[in-house]
Amino acid sequence: MDQEGQPLLSKDFQQVLLATASGNNSSWTERAVLNNESTDAVKHEPALGQNDVFDLDPLSFDKWVPFLRRALDKNQLDPVIDELENSIEDNFQGLELQLLQDSQMNDKLETSIDEIANIQGMVQDTLSSEISKFQIRLSESANELIVKKQMYVNNKKISLKISEATILITKVVRILELSSKCQELITERKFFKVLQNLDSLEKLYLQEFKNYNFQFLIEIYNSIPFLQKVTKDECINLIRNSLNLNLGKNLIKVGQEFVAIYENELLPQWLETRSKMKLTNFKFNSPIEISMRDESFLAKLNLGEFFQLDDFHDSIMIFQNLNELSVLSGEFNKEYELRKTKLMYPLIWKKNKTAAYQMDSLLRGTGTTPGSTAHDVSTDDPFTQSLSLHFLQDYFLKILGFLLYDINLNKATEFILVDNNYNSTNEFWDGLMDRLSPYLSYFIDEKLKTEEDMIKLKDFLCIYVAILENFKLNIEPLYKILVSIFEKFCSVSLRAFDDEFQILLNDDDFMPLSINDKTLYEKVLKICWMKEGEHLSLPDPTNGEPFAVTLPFSPLYPMTCTLAKKTYSKITAFLSIFYRHELHTLNNILVKTMDDIFNDIVNKKIRSKLESTSREEIAQILVNLDYFIIAAKEFSNFMTRENILQNPDMEIRLSSIKYLAESRKLAETKLIELIDSKISDILETIEIDWQITEVRQDPDISIIDLAQFLEMMFASTLQNLPYSVQTLLIFREFDSLTRQFMGLLLHDTPSTITHESIMNFEVDVNYLESIIPRIFPSTPGTIDSNGYQSPMTPSTPTFPNANGVDAPTLFENNIKSLEATFMELKQCIELLKTQGKDYNEPEIRLRKYSRIRQEDAALLLSKIQHFVSSVEGANGDDTSVMDSSSIFNSESASVIDSNTSRIAKFFNRR
């Protein structure tokens, strides 16, 4: 709005415009004069001067640019043009009048008008001529254009057809190339690419040539199903070849490599680690062992390094694309079943009504019929005839390789080929073991003989079980075989112990063990289990005394202890590295084995020796049995502490302890019977003259023999017996002896006896009583807490005090108790000596004859009184007296048996 009063053209711009106009006018005038001077120039170039009038000086135009640009920037170009036109009218308004008043200018104008008229005519002629020519040329060009256009259209149609033909030919060539490529790929065994090319070929044909009747293309298209079938057949053949490659000798190699890595790398590393870290309670393949394995060893167990399964991947993709995966699975299973059949050879199923089902179940990995019994093993079976340790190892290695292959194949193919049965490998393994177990049991029972072979088979199968366990396969059937091997090993160890013990028993001298070497003595003490608190008084080497010790047991005991410990160590070593399942079962087998050693072998074989008639041998057996009972108890304690279950609350007690104790009682009985028999034999030789009229001062020679026998027997032959047994025997024999003499006096004497014979009989009885202190040791030793006599040196047996009782007091009490056995007999003798003069007085009778029954007293008095009244008639009865003097008869024997209970009371007295 403010700009409306202001001129849009600045003074500077107006001056430029005016300067330009004046300059152009003068320039035009000069050129017009020059043109007039040259007629030819005007004639030939009439339009040139006219156009030059309107030419602008470029320099002048450049001067306009800043002003025009400014107007453009302000969007004022149109107003500037309008104002410019108005300015021209304003500036040149009086110019026409000025020109008319100028005569020179008028002349020039007239001349110019004529010239302009001439120029106009000339221009018209020229234009007409040019237009004619142009029309002719235009007509020619139009015709030419029409012709060329027609040619172009024709060419374009041809070109289009050529292009279409080219495309078609290209596609045909593509089909031919695909067909040819399929053939090449089939030859190269790249079947998945074959399928891709066939798919492309089919799509290309259906899209482009379905409506064409090209016979060769139709033939190519019709060959697609055939090529697909060829591809499928070749894939199946490829799988067969892959199975041939992987399931041949390669299986044993794979099994060997796996077992070798476990046996030669993982196991030695664990044994070293276990020893260093004192992890003896942990077994191989336990969680702690697995956690400590070297990763470099585990890297060698990558199944992908052992088996090539690329062919399976291609085949699965091919059949998946063809939607015929079930066909592949069926063909694969058929082929796989054949491989499994070859794999199991020479294992053959018995032909029975369930054989077909069992075979099918095994091959399919579904096990056997539920509830089916174990298969019988025939010695004519090829598998049975092939059984050997080497054969079984190779067979199991082959099976292991197959199991690993099956596991790897199923995982790599995502269990597609087994219908997503994730337990297929386990089912096959269980079915195989169900069939194989009877053969293994047969081999263990019948053909596995040596401990070396058992250890080899055990180590191999334990490594085998570890591998199966790490691959999550069922180890139960094979572990049962390992338990059977352990049972067989224990059985063989038991037989070996039996053989060696029999040799030891036959070589044993049944004499106390004398040792002259201190080192040997210390070894014996370490080997043997001794009685609690038992010790020896060893010679003092500083005094120059030779080392000499006699142990109460015979050499059989330490040798048996050594043999038992070695056997136990051997058996536990058999279990120490691998066995870590079913420990209760293994522990029961171990305990039973040791029980059998102590009972079925040691106890029964020693018990058979009790048929001996040697008192010394029976006595030594009794001593040995005492120590074997201790050994069995200590072995029970040892097995409790070291039990393989590692259970601190478990207590093991061998049942053989009871049977050994029974044998000990039997040995006591046998020893008593032998002593009784010997004493009875001696008593049969004793003859007492009851009619004698002379009194002798010395005992009868037969009484002296009897006393010497008793003294020798108790002081030497039976000196190593336990103190309780010695005491029992002493009391029993003296009680039996006094009762037999009592029976002799009451029932085996004639109706009349002389006073002198009574005096002589008293001398004999007093002599027998006098040996009592000599039978018991004069220097008491020590007795252990169980009442056993301690071992001794060859010279002197020792009798300890028991349960806190002073040994001398016990010694005195025993002598007094033993002397009391003669009391009744001595009272009878005293009654006969006094002829019963004071017997009728109650006070005296109770004091002097308390042990004599009234009927016995009456019987005795009748004999002595009868003798007094009929001395003369006594000589006629000598024969009857002699006939009745034998003291060993059935009545006296019954007296011995009836007094057993009373002997026990004597033994328990203090």
Swiss-Prot record:
GO terms under biological process: exocytosis; Golgi to plasma membrane transport; intracellular protein transport; vesicle docking involved in exocytosis; vesicle tethering involved in exocytosis
Domain of life of the organism encoding this protein: Eukaryota
Coiled-coil zones: 88-116
Molecular function as annotated in GO: small GTPase binding
Keyword Ribonucleoprotein: no
GO cellular component, one term: incipient cellular bud site
Record localization: Cytoplasm; Cell membrane
UniProt entry keywords in alphabetical sequence: Cell membrane, Coiled coil, Cytoplasm, Exocytosis, Membrane, Phosphoprotein, Protein transport, Transport
Family affiliation: Belongs to the SEC15 family.
Described function: Component of the exocyst complex involved in the docking of exocytic vesicles with fusion sites on the plasma membrane.
Record's miscellaneous remark: Present with 4280 molecules/cell in log phase SD medium.
Subunit structure comment from the entry: The exocyst complex is composed of SEC3, SEC5, SEC6, SEC8, SEC10, SEC15, EXO70 and EXO84. Interacts with SEC4.
Protein name: Exocyst complex component SEC15
Organism of derivation: Saccharomyces cerevisiae (strain ATCC 204508 / S288c) (Baker's yeast)
